[in-house]
Amino acid sequence: MVPISASTAAGAAKAGRDAAAFELIGAPFLALGRDEEELRKSMDALRQNISFYASTRSYHAVLAHHGWEDTGMELHRLSLAGKWAQMPALISDEMLEQWAVVALHDDFAQKLRERANGVFGTVLVDLPAAARADTGFVRETVQRLRA
C-alpha cells in the first residue's frame, strides 16, 4: 500500500474515516511517440488539454504549488476572452514533464514506473488510440511493467 499524502489523511480524519483504508489511483496524462516527431505532436496535443484544465481556477492551487500562478491567471483571462487557440503555447515543456509521462515508446514503461512508484497503489493507463492499436507496444509495455 502506498502512503497517503498529508492532505488526503487530513481529509479522511475530518470525515471520520480511516486513511489507511484508501488506495490512491492515478491516471497520469500521457504524451507518447514512436519517434521524436510523433512525440512532439503528442506533446502539442496534450498542451491543449492541460491549458484548458489550467485555465480553470479550481486547478490554480496546482499551478501555485509549482510557482506558475501567473500562467494560470493568464490562461483564465484567455479562456474568458475565447482565445482558446493561444492557450497551449503557455504550457511549457517543463510543465508537461511535471504533469505527464512524456516518453518515446521504448522508454514509456520505465518512465511510468518512475512516476507512479510510491505515489499510486494502482495506475490507470489510458493509452492514445495509436499506441493502443499497436499490439506489440502494448504487449511489450505490459511485460516491462510486470518485470
Where are these regions (language model features)?
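Active-site-adjacent structural elements that line small-molecule/cofactor binding pockets in enzymes
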Residues: 1-147
